[in-house]
A protein has these predicted regions:
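C-terminal "cap" of GNAT-fold acetyltransferases
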Residues: 46, 110-161
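Conserved beta-strand in the GNAT
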Residues: 56, 62-70, 77-82
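A short helix-loop-beta-strand connector motif used in the catalytic cores of GNAT acetyltransferases and
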Residues: 44-56, 77
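Hydrophobic adenine-recognition pocket in adenosine-nucleotide-binding enzymes
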Residues: 7, 81-83, 116
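Conserved acetyl-CoA-binding loop-helix of GNAT-fold acetyltransferases
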Residues: 83, 89-102, 128-129
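Conserved GNAT-fold acetyl-CoA-binding loop/helix
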Residues: 17-45
């Protein structure tokens, strides 16, 4: 059973390792700069604790996935969704998205959004299955010479006062 917990200071190496392992199979399809940015090192993960929440998915106490978020005005940015290759297609990404969306809804954000690359068609399918739609294609010059997609989802049931 997948359990998702909030990441805490001290989880930086675990998160960095999960991200690297998840994206390593795509290293040759990324530009060097894009891969370096995507496969965030522990020191950069440490900085993210001040920027927004992070979660770790575990099976039997073993970390198998991670995701983080960045609160903005009306939108909540999803970044660094990463699932260990050996655990992919097991509902972990789905569970992480559910936890993240619940957090964003409870915080009264109106939308979730993310960027993904064309080299990750499985990620795009997961996001579309969860109600995300493509806002626009992002040109290569916008992100480390890699084209991609900006995707968004309206969060239902957000009550504004």
């Amino acid at each position: 059973m997948v359990e998702v917990r909030p990441a805490v200071p001290g989880d930086e190496e675990t998160i960095a390792s999960l991200i690297l392992e998840a994206f390593a199979p795509f290293r040759d399809e990324y530009t060097a700069d894009a891969f370096e940015y995507t496969a965030a090192k522990a020191d950069r993960i440490r900085e993210r604790f001040d920027e927004g929440p992070m979660w770790i998915a575990e099976i039997d106490g073993q970390p198998v996935g991670t995701v983080s978020g960045l609160p903005e005005e009306e939108r909540f940015y999803i970044r660094s969704m990463a699932i260990k290759p050996s655990a992919q297609r097991g509902g972990i990404g789905q569970r992480l998205l559910e936890v993240l969306e619940t957090f964003a809804r409870d915080a009264e954000f109106e939308k979730l959004y993310l960027y993904t690359t064309f080299v990750l068609p499985g990620a795009k399918r997961l996001y579309e299955k969860n109600g995300f739609y493509v806002l626009r294609e992002t040109p290569p010059e916008e992100w480390y010479n890699m084209g991609g997609l900006e995707m968004e989802k309206l969060i239902e049931d957000v009550i504004r006062s």
